[in-house]
Amino acid sequence: GTGG
């Protein structure tokens, strides 16, 4: 997944 991607997070920021």
From Swiss-Prot:
One Gene Ontology term of the biological-process aspect is: adaptive immune response
- Please list the coiled coil stretches: none
Q: Which UniProt keywords apply?
A: Adaptive immunity, Cell membrane, Immunity, Membrane, Receptor, T cell receptor
An example GO CC term for this entry is: T cell receptor complex
Which residues constitute the signal peptide according to the record?
none
Q: Which domain of life is it from?
A: Eukaryota
Q: Where in the cell is it found?
A: Cell membrane
Q: How does it assemble?
A: Alpha-beta TR is a heterodimer composed of an alpha and beta chain; disulfide-linked. The alpha-beta TR is associated with the transmembrane signaling CD3 coreceptor proteins to form the TR-CD3 (TcR or TCR). The assembly of alpha-beta TR heterodimers with CD3 occurs in the endoplasmic reticulum where a single alpha-beta TR heterodimer associates with one CD3D-CD3E heterodimer, one CD3G-CD3E heterodimer and one CD247 homodimer forming a stable octameric structure. CD3D-CD3E and CD3G-CD3E heterodimers preferentially associate with TR alpha and TR beta chains, respectively.
- Which function does this protein serve? D region of the variable domain of T cell receptor (TR) beta chain that participates in the antigen recognition. Alpha-beta T cell receptors are antigen specific receptors which are essential to the immune response and are present on the cell surface of T lymphocytes. Recognize peptide-major histocompatibility (MH) (pMH) complexes that are displayed by antigen presenting cells (APC), a prerequisite for efficient T cell adaptive immunity against pathogens.
Record's protein name: T cell receptor beta diversity 1
UniProt organism field: Homo sapiens (Human)
